Amino acid sequence: MNKLWIRLLLVIAILAGAVCIIMREPVKLGLDLKGGVYAVLEAAPEKEGDVIDNETMNSLIEVLDRRINGIGVAESVVQKAGNNRVIIELPGISDTTEAINMIGKTALLEFKIMDENGNLGPTLLTGGALKKAQVGYGNLGEPQINFEMKPEGAIEFARITRENVGKQLAIVLDGKVQTAPVIRTEIPGGTGSISGNYTVEEAKRTATLLNSGALPIKAEIVETRTVGASLGDE
């Protein structure tokens, strides 16, 4: 009889512990409960017929995950689908355009010398040299993006500015010149700013993109839709 009671008490204790653990775990509210944006991103090989390897796809997922975390989306889903697609779920997001702006941009930052005719030279430095980027404000209070480079990037940036005094240094994002100031003197320390008539929100979004890194491969959003909170309404 005593053994039976001991076993019964042991079972009750185990069940109570399991309930406590379950209650402590946060309930994940996906698209069914919160609604949001569902998107499918398709990676494209550089050359037709090339195969995209798992390492590249994993790198793509990591960058996308950092971007989404950077804008504070909780309970998001970023997962591989098939050989070259990524499914993205963003609960609580209602602005599809905003989501596309964050997900679909390559965010390739390049530093190039611009000649007097506006022609761009070869890429001298990329966003891979950045340590961090954050929103700042210029002399007139206009939003801009302040950046700091990694040690090796700072050394290269100093060399580039030293050897090109008097020339324009174009800062290019996804093929579009953001700003092209004239280099007045060598810039040591690896710090600088990017101005481009940004709103505060645009500056924040761009800083997040730069901090998360450029997509490792060209990718295109092939499907996107807003999903209602179907279960939450029941």
Listing of model-derived features with the role each one plays in the protein:
Residues 1-234:
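A structural signal for conserved, well-ordered secondary-structure elements
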